[in-house]
Amino acid sequence: MQTLLLNSQDVDENARTGRVIDAVEGAFVAYERGDAQMPPKSYIDLPEYNGDFRSMPAYMDAGDWDAAGIKWVNVHTDNPDEYDLPTVMGTMIYSDPETAFPLAIMDGTELTMKRTGAAAAVATDYLSVPDADSLGIVGAGVQSYTQLEAIAEVRDIEEVVVSDLDEERVADFIDAFADEFDVRAGSIAEAGHCDVLSTVTPVRDPIVGPEDVGEHTHINAMGADAAGKHELADDLLLDATIVIDDHEQCTHSGEINVPYAAGTLTDEDIYGEIGEIVVGNKPGRAGEDGFDGVSVFDSTGLAIQDVAAARVVYEYADDNDNGYPFDLLGLGE
């Protein structure tokens, strides 16, 4: 048997956005129903290198298919300036659950961007107003691209407002999407008054307050991925309907981690997990039992999302003879 090696371009080409969104939604369902195993994300802190490693293993049973894998990913903030390397680099090993054979080794950085966008799309589908047609984005880095690509799959987005202190990054983003959307630069408040807002920044001091968003804005808070990171002001969070992806991860390192640790925000302020809404155990925004006002999706990123997205990439690549097959285990086949 051969193991398929897939670089970042291979992952990009084979991670079909609609299929990844469906797969990530299926992962939320499996997790909520207890059909997944996902040990807590483990960290190796390396303060001497201003970085850390994270391991994210998972198994999920989606009913008509199952999948297993592990992502090994880092965050080294000095990399771009000192080593001309990305801040975040990831490697995904995707395995056959029945035999444990490593079916694929793929770039986990591109995979993370794809599944992160897909997670925001799932949340947007359930938590935003059904007729949402405008999207604001705070932070014009690499994650902003997949936010727009994925969310546009679940809502008819026409207007896009992007806000970032780096004018060059904003210009690059506008150039990338100018032919598809009415996209322009704007302030945080202009972005926040769109129907949907995605925040994708690594800040530790909140940059979005209640005055910066509309009465019914849905916010995908995607930037916080470590203790101390915090994009949204406490009073905004406390007045919003908060939906999380996982209680343990969100209270430790998600958007709510800072006010939760301080006792400002408690479990009573959390509406529920996204899986509860996807399976119908709690209502989303739509319907007579749905909620109104501002909503926040606190997304820390789950290993089951990586596994679900990796399956999409592997299956499509394998069917279309993409990637580089090699004899990793030396079985001589």
Language-model regions: role of each:
Residues 230-333:
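Adenosine-phosphate binding glycine-rich loop
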